[in-house]
């Protein structure tokens, strides 16, 4: 959804979760344990990444499909729980803010990475709804997944992200709360664009 908003506004787009997935992928490929915060932070600082034409590249290799597996989502959540890793990736994320603007997608974008953002939106939906959407995305990309497994992994991720000591997942008062359980992607995009234009006009 955030990418659709960025396209509509002609802004740059940051998928912050991809940076944590890339760190996790690099660590797993090199056999690093995901509980070694110091080593993970070093990997995060040295990542050779590029985003081109909707694809993600790591050290010159297209890793787009590998990043979108459920396994990598779980690994990324584990990696993101380490304050050392978050600190290393903070400046890399902030470097994406370039004219004419940026739409950043991530669980701590408004609270930590861009606390001065002119518009913050806290997106949520029932876990079952998010699981259905995620399952559809995976199947469309040819990645088989069982619905109960997707639901369970989302619940675990929510629990981890809400309880981590640094940048826990929660709704902050200065962010618009948008529940998309019964709202289509098109409707959600329209709501965010309308809010942005209202603020720009005021």
Predicted regions and their residues:
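Amphipathic alpha-helical transducer elements in NTP-driven molecular machines
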Residues: 16, 20, 37, 41, ...
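Small-molecule kinase domains that catalyze NTP-dependent phosphoryl transfer to phosphate-bearing small molecules
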Residues: 43, 53, 93-100, 107-112, ...
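N-terminal phosphate/diphosphate-binding loop that engages ATP/GTP or pyrophosphate donors
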Residues: 4-70
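Residue-level signal for inorganic ion chemistry
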Residues: 17, 60, 89, 103, ...
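C-terminal alpha-helix
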Residues: 191-202
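ATP-dependent NMP and nucleoside kinases share a basic, alpha-helical "lid"
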Residues: 64-143
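Hydrophobic positions on the alpha1 helix immediately C-terminal to the Walker A/P-loop
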Residues: 1
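Conserved beta-strand scaffold positions in the cores of enzyme catalytic domains, especially
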Residues: 13, 120, 175-177
């Amino acid at each position: 959804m955030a990418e659709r908003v960025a396209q509509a506004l002609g802004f740059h787009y940051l998928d912050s979760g991809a940076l944590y997935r890339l760190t996790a992928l690099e660590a797993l490929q090199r056999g690093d344990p995901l509980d070694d915060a110091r080593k993970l932070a070093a990997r995060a600082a040295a990542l050779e990444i590029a985003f081109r034409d909707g694809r993600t590249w790591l050290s010159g290799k297209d890793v787009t499909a590998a990043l979108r597996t459920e396994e990598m989502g779980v690994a990324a959540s584990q990696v993101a729980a380490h304050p050392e890793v978050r600190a290393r990736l903070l400046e890399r994320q902030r470097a994406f803010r370039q004219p004419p603007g940026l739409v950043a997608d991530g669980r701590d974008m408004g609270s930590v990475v861009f606390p001065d953002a002119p518009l913050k939106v806290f997106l949520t939906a029932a876990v079952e709804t998010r699981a259905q959407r995620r399952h559809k995305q995976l199947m469309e990309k040819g990645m088989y997944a069982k619905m109960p497994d997707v639901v369970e992994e989302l619940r675990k991720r929510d629990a981890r992200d809400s309880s981590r000591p640094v940048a826990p997942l929660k709704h902050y008062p200065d962010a618009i709360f948008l529940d998309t359980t019964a709202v289509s992607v098109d409707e959600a995009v329209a709501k965010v664009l309308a809010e942005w234009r209202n603020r720009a006009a005021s």
